[in-house]
């Protein structure tokens, strides 16, 4: 095709100067336009006999260099130009090129592809003529296309997998012929013995497969250790101990019934909350690593989450109560009392979104403790000196809770997710309760005790 280079060749008009294209404590969150320049279109050589000169029509198809999917190409490209005739009287002689001879010699290689729009014309990206530049893309075992260097030898995926299986399973093969079978792309599966021997002869290393297996095992063990270290560092037993240590004894409630509450239900709730705030500090100190934080960060976390922590506690305590809640003081607050006091809406949400859900899934004390620890370790609390440390502690509680649910309730694979789904409801209800408390504090009709008043003096939760 490229035989006679002494022929005169015609080029498209403007070949010498092809134009280029130019491109033109509160819950608060923690927290290249490149130009693609198309490559100049290169004219393609074509044979033109001396006796019958022809004019070559150029199809202007600029080629854009491939880049990242995030690159923005801003150059405005016009439509392809039409056929351009060469100016009369201008004939150019195509100089002989040793590179063109290389193209002739490897014209069957897959490296040579036709230029888009001009079928039959080889592209100008000539392969290197250095020894081995083409061989390295061929599988040394069967001659198929190589996918890279595997176990010391350039090989295809098929021969790589065959050698790895042979070594890992310690397979032994036999040859039915004379141990000199031809191994190529079409017949590589006919004799496993000769294929394996050729792998060894070409330089594949058994120890490379064994080292790869060892690295995979070590990586798996390391990942397993990382997964278990989270709940070993935050043992669920200690979280359960913290819950049991501060929970009022059920026998202290006596035989109190719904009628024991003689005062306004809101007053009873505020009084119980004030008492529970003292025990809340003791509970937090028993949670692993909480006391390791700075004193300032401990105060910030308690101020940011005290309302949600108390609501979670009395909601879980009330799962056995019919249509009401059980306070830490032993008093019951019935739904009807809450409605008469003007807090029926938020009371109904507590019963529906928290108490009822906890009862349906039979949430145990360990799960309750983990959920409360997740609320406690809030990395978004405003003013923390080291939010990343708090976030790490929260992630450890996540890992502990997930491991616990998988081990204790293997028949409920979605239990961990169900538990976490209670947190948004707890957050929303906690904010609404704060609004009520601030209202009662503002109007002054409800007596609010000292500790609770101190918490309300810094309204961190209102966002």
UniProtKB/Swiss-Prot annotation:
The keyword Zinc applies. Keywords: Acetylation, Cytoplasm, DNA-binding, Metal-binding, Nucleus, Receptor, Transcription, Transcription regulation, Zinc, Zinc-finger. Expressed in aortic endothelial cells (at protein level). A zinc finger (NR C4-type) spans 139-159, 175-199. One of its GO terms (cellular component) is RNA polymerase II transcription regulator complex. Residues 205-230 are annotated as: Hinge. InterPro entries: NHR-like_dom_sf, Nuc_recep-AF1, Nucl_hrmn_rcpt_lig-bd, Nuclear_hormone_rcpt_NR2, Nuclear_hrmn_rcpt, Retinoid-X_rcpt/HNF4, Znf_hrmn_rcpt, Znf_NHR/GATA. Residues 136-211 bind DNA. Pfam families: Hormone_recep (PF00104), Nuc_recep-AF1 (PF11825), zf-C4 (PF00105). One of its GO terms (molecular function) is nuclear receptor activity. Homodimer. Heterodimer with a RAR molecule. Binds DNA preferentially as a RAR/RXR heterodimer. Interacts with RARA. Composed of three domains: a modulating N-terminal domain, a DNA-binding domain and a C-terminal ligand-binding domain. Receptor for retinoic acid. Retinoic acid receptors bind as heterodimers to their target response elements in response to their ligands, all-trans or 9-cis retinoic acid, and regulate gene expression in various biological processes. The RAR/RXR heterodimers bind to the retinoic acid response elements (RARE) composed of tandem 5'-AGGTCA-3' sites known as DR1-DR5. The high affinity ligand for RXRs is 9-cis retinoic acid. This is Retinoic acid receptor RXR-gamma.
